[in-house]
Amino acid sequence: MIEREVVVQSEDIKLKGILCLPDGDGPFPVLLYVSGSGPINRNENIPGLSLNNSRIIAHHLAQQNIASLRYDKRGVGDSGGDFYSASHSDLVDDAVACTQFLQQQASVEPAKIFVAGHSEGSIIAAQVATRQQNIAGIILLSPLCDKMESILMKQAQDLKSMVMGRKGFKALPLKFVTLLFDPIKVQKKLIKKIKES
């Protein structure tokens, strides 16, 4: 397996990510992984919570001779732009740019590009499939089954409760950041931006 740092141009924003390729020459079928809501990096991590979900999936796919691309959302990790000023449409445009990038890779089979979206990423994956005719299929992981506003507010409340419930000295920096950037207020701001976009 080879992991290659890549840069995807989405209008004036440079998105950085990892193209994970199986051993061998290819071309390979490929999966674009679109993360869920919030400022999540290419491995589906946020400060204080390292899940590495998309990294684990990418490594398992490589063992099955399937390539994958995972990327930092705009304004997150090594990608340019500002996450908090990005609209939902911007995030869809970014994912579309990633599929166009994949079409140009010699190691990728252009007729076998799949898009997997987790949570909010499932909405984005579906929108990418309607805009890009070459998408072979979509995979919806934990798709939204309620109003997005309700889901976002529940996530913020759960995150705040989880962080504030932590004990010990190591939890203090995370608690401080949570108090400084209250997840509930951040989600309300995000919801407002989504409604305006």
Predicted regions and their residues:
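Alpha/beta-hydrolase fold nucleophile elbow
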Residues: 108-119
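Alpha/beta-hydrolase
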Residues: 34, 71-73, 141
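Alpha/beta-hydrolase active-site loop
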Residues: 85-105
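Short, surface-exposed "cap/lid" segments of acyl-processing enzymes
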Residues: 24-60
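N-terminal cap/lid segment of alpha/beta-hydrolase-fold proteins
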Residues: 1-26
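Accessory cap/linker subdomain of secreted extracellular hydrolases
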Residues: 141-197
